[in-house]
Amino acid sequence: MKRSVLYILCSLVTTLLVASCCPKNPAPNSVKTAHGNTDWHIDTAEEFLTGNDINGNPSASNHCPDTWTKTHMHVGLTNTNTYYYDKGVTAAGQDNLSTNGIDKPMLFFYAGHGAPTLFNTLGNSAYLTNMRLGNCQGSNDGTLRYYWQCSCEVFAHGPKTCTGIPYDYACPGDFDGSPDSDNMRNVYERWGPILNPALRMACGSSTLAYCHEGETNKIWDNYNNKGYDVADAFIDGLHRYTWNTPLCITTGGLFVSGTPLFDNTFTNAPNPSGSYYHIQYLSNFATTAPSIFEVIIPEFLPIYELIPLPLPDPLRKYKFVEKDDWMYSTDEIKGRGPAIKVNRISGAVYLLGEQRFDEKAKPLEEKEYISLAERFIENQGLTEKDISKPAGTRMVIQRISREEKQPDIQKFQKNVTLTFKRQITLDSKTVPFVGEGGLISIQLNNDGTLFNASKVWRQIKEISRTTRAKTYEQAYNEALAQIKERDAYKLADWTWGYEEQAGNVRQTELKAVFIFNFLPVDPEKIIDYPPRIIKISAHIE
């Protein structure tokens, strides 16, 4: 009898222990997306996964790797905020559900309208105060590792206004340690409680954001093709316009290089965490800026025939193996893969180096990075005649203590990138390029050594035909016709130029486009009227 009771008690204890535990890690390379609005954001959430819109039409050439396990959640549902909530905070929380909960995969991506303390969830809104991510404790069963969000201001950080910048919360580096308020946003205060120790990072936009196929395409082009690490791929990918300042936040120890902000690839392992918060954001060089062109639209615009770029002569000494559309060098960078890869359908070239970071070393002067980048492209045979002066950016990490009431704010440079843009001359006027091609990009470690480099630059064979060009007024009116609530929007800026695609795209023609950036007239109504980016063909065909 005693043995029977003991057996029953042991079985009960075992059952309770198993029930109270959850899987240590999520499934490797598992990704789920959700949309908070059924406007273009439902397409964005699908494009992130497959490169298609919600109806299956191809729309983005780069997307989540094909080998990953993918799910687009909440399609056809309404009032989905409970799937973002943790039941340890609110009884309604269901973020641990295997079907619709966001706290289950390795990576979760959200696209929709937002504001500093909330974001839309298909009819209602989710508030940050009800969220906890990666908390695999008891029955919470949260195993998320990476949380990516494309919304306006949900990750707002720093002062509302910055000198010389007309957009709110565009300078996270000027954060002064104040509590979260409308005038000084504090991402540590709002997102700190959400970051349970196992979550590796959460990323979003400090400023206004636009989220569609162009943004998801650039994020995955950065990661899949250019070799950017996880945080860099998101931040650079979402920073397509001057008014968009993304950032990532994580917990970690004293040494910044030991944090997930240095994840070269996605992992389903938990974050070792630590007693510090770290954020990463992008900052422009003080000494360089993109070229400003005199905007004169010619009466006629050539359409050019493109062919793949020949392999640069200095790279012909390497041995390559071919697989599908790619050539991979047999030389490898330890822990990163082939030192060189070439896309055969475009001729795009990608080069890798070792990642180096010394927290105590002083970064170089900006002019030294520019000189090193120019020397590299010359030595590797990447130089072109029709090229802009480089625009320089730096990735910056900000660190504070999680425990001190008035923490010391410290900053570190993580790496720098120099970007050279292609140009075409028409009627003695310089026409710029837009898109993910027509670029030479050199990412350097702080000591000036190579981390990543790419040249996406198809060769122009000849002019295939010439068309009349649309005037600015014609293109603007076409763009405006796509906005229903015209009185709620204003034109913030616009550009035009020839559009070259990412390096893994088969592109045989080079055409010009107008790109119009519309922002809300009332900045306080961004959740109702988020930014709109509208692209219009510049040709009358």
Regions picked out by a protein language model, each given a short descriptive name:
Residues 373, 442, 514-516:
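Conserved histidines in hydrophobic membrane contexts and catalytic metal-binding motifs
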Residues 450, 456-510:
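Charged, low-complexity helical/coil segments in non-catalytic cytosolic or luminal regions
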